[in-house]
Amino acid sequence: MARITTEDCTGKISNHFDLTLVAARRARQLENGNTPLVDDVRNNKPTVTALREIAAGHIGTELLTRNK
């Protein structure tokens, strides 16, 4: 599996601050048992999985406006 970088995600969320908030909130959701939206997450930490979901376009800034 290739390494994920923030540059892979900035095409989807251009504001670095929003990117950080979205990734953190999604990682928290994954830690609390939400189902990952990308395949092959067995060795990834929740933060890496969250970034992969953002890079794939599954998660975006709409997560910031939704209720937790």
Swiss-Prot record:
Keywords, ordered alphabetically: DNA-directed RNA polymerase, Nucleotidyltransferase, Transcription, Transferase
Keyword field contains Transcription: yes
Catalytic reaction(s) noted: RNA(n) + a ribonucleoside 5'-triphosphate = RNA(n+1) + diphosphate
InterPro entries: DNA-dir_RNA_pol_omega (IPR003716), Pol_omega/Rpo6/RPB6 (IPR006110), RPB6/omega-like_sf (IPR036161)
Signal peptide stretch: none
Coiled coil residues, start to end: none
EC number annotated for this UniProt entry: 2.7.7.6
GO CC annotation: cytosolic DNA-directed RNA polymerase complex
Keyword Nucleotidyltransferase recorded: yes
A Pfam family of this chain: RNA_pol_Rpb6
Known function: Promotes RNA polymerase assembly. Latches the N- and C-terminal regions of the beta' subunit thereby facilitating its interaction with the beta and alpha subunits.
HAMAP family membership: RNApol_bact_RpoZ (MF_00366)
Summary of subunit composition and partner proteins: The RNAP catalytic core consists of 2 alpha, 1 beta, 1 beta' and 1 omega subunit. When a sigma factor is associated with the core the holoenzyme is formed, which can initiate transcription.
UniProt similarity note: Belongs to the RNA polymerase subunit omega family.
NCBIfam families xrefs: rpoZ
Protein name: DNA-directed RNA polymerase subunit omega
